[in-house]
Amino acid sequence: MRRFLVLLVKEERALFSSPIAYVLIAVFLLIMGYSFTLALFISHSMTLVHLFFQIFVLFLLTVPIITMRLIAEERKLRTIEVLLTSRANETQIVFAKFVASMSLIVLMLILSGAYAIVLAIYGDPDWGPIFSGYLGLVLLAAALVGVGLLTSSLTSNQIIAALLSLSAFLLLWIIDEYGYLLPDPFDSLVVNMSLSVHFKPFATGSMYLSDVAFYLSATMLSLFLSVRALAWR
């Protein structure tokens, strides 16, 4: 546990000492602020549903930037060998990088909570969909970071890692549109692999155990494969 905490502090320092983290936060809040203002004062929308779907898309684009360097950079600089020859094992390394990345994303979501406060000031929002929407975003982010870690563990090139994860995210985003064209039972199998299909219930105030299980399973499988890839290479 102590070794994990040491690794976590190291990852947090590396992440938040980089200007990339603050640029991502600034761009994220700028886009969300603009969209929220339009929805509130022009469309008079008193929900965050539209905002949740925009955050969904932004995560598809920003998580590859966050995760691309996690292991790929360690391989390029050959510092991964130093970590592996220390008392830290592959599982501790992967989970430290995962938690550090999630801390940045959770911080972004906490800051976006200001929009919910504004809704409460100007009206009487339904808090159920707001809480379920944020829960869905956390679960989505965990799955995306897991996949991003996996792609980063497969290469020493950050750009390749980012492109691999971005391609995977975009495929899992639109796969349901093509799944409906397949014959039974392949159609339901492919559709159920879609990130958006499992996110929509959260954004609209519904919570199903199957959707929670999907994101948790995707996260744990990605982390497991990341550990194995790190051990194998």
Q: Where are the regions that the model predicts?
A:
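Secretory targeting signals
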Residues: 35-37, 48, 58, 100-159, ...
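Hydrophobic/aromatic residues in alpha-helical transmembrane segments
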Residues: 63-67, 115, 146-147, 225-226
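Aromatic- and glycine-rich beta-strand/loop motifs that create alpha-glucan
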Residues: 1-21
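Transmembrane helix boundary and interhelical loop/hinge segments in multi-pass membrane proteins
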Residues: 47-48, 66-84, 98
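Hydrophobic alpha-helical transmembrane segments of multi-pass membrane transport/permease proteins
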Residues: 19-38, 54-63, 167-171
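Long, hydrophobic alpha-helical segments
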Residues: 53-73, 108
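Terminal transmembrane helical anchor/hairpin motif
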Residues: 164, 168-229
